[in-house]
C-alpha cells in the first residue's frame, strides 16, 4: 500500500526534495498549493526587504532555473507528474508578483498572494495549455510564471488607476 503513495518515495533529508516541497509547506493539507504560496510569500517578503528589488529579481530568476531541475527530479523520484506537494513553482510565482508591488505594506502583500493564487487556480489561456502539455520540470515551473505575469498585470493596473 505504501508503494502507491508517491510521498513515501521522497525524503525531507534530501535537499532537492526539501526545496521542491517548499521546506515542507507543500505537505500541508488541504490545499498544498495555497500553503506553499503562503510560505513563499513570507520568505519572499523577508528576502525582498533584505535584498532589494534588483537582487531579488536575479535571485528569483535563479530560483526558476533551479526549480526546473528540482521539479523534474522530484517528479521522477515520486513517479507522478506535478504532484500537489511540489510547490517550488508557487514560491517562484509569488516571488515574481512580490517584486512588482509598489510597497511591502500588508495590503499589497495580501494582493500579491491573492492575485497569484487566483490565476494559478483559474489557469486562463495559455496557462492551462502549458500545464497540460509540458510534462517536465520546465512545464511545472512555467505555468506558475504565467500566472504570476497575469497577477503582475493586475497589480500594474491597480497602481495606474490609483494615481
Curated annotation (Swiss-Prot):
Species annotation: Haemophilus influenzae (strain ATCC 51907 / DSM 11121 / KW20 / Rd)
Lineage, highest ranks first: Bacteria, Pseudomonadati, Pseudomonadota, Gammaproteobacteria, Pasteurellales
Annotated catalysed reactions: a 1,2-diacyl-sn-glycero-3-phospho-(1'-sn-glycero-3'-phosphate) + H2O = a 1,2-diacyl-sn-glycero-3-phospho-(1'-sn-glycerol) + phosphate
InterPro entries: PgpA, PgpA-like_sf, YutG/PgpA
Protein name: Phosphatidylglycerophosphatase A
PANTHER family: PHOSPHATIDYLGLYCEROPHOSPHATASE A
A biological-process GO annotation: phosphatidylglycerol biosynthetic process
EC number: 3.1.3.27
Record's function text: Lipid phosphatase which dephosphorylates phosphatidylglycerophosphate (PGP) to phosphatidylglycerol (PG).
Keyword Mitochondrion belongs to the record: no
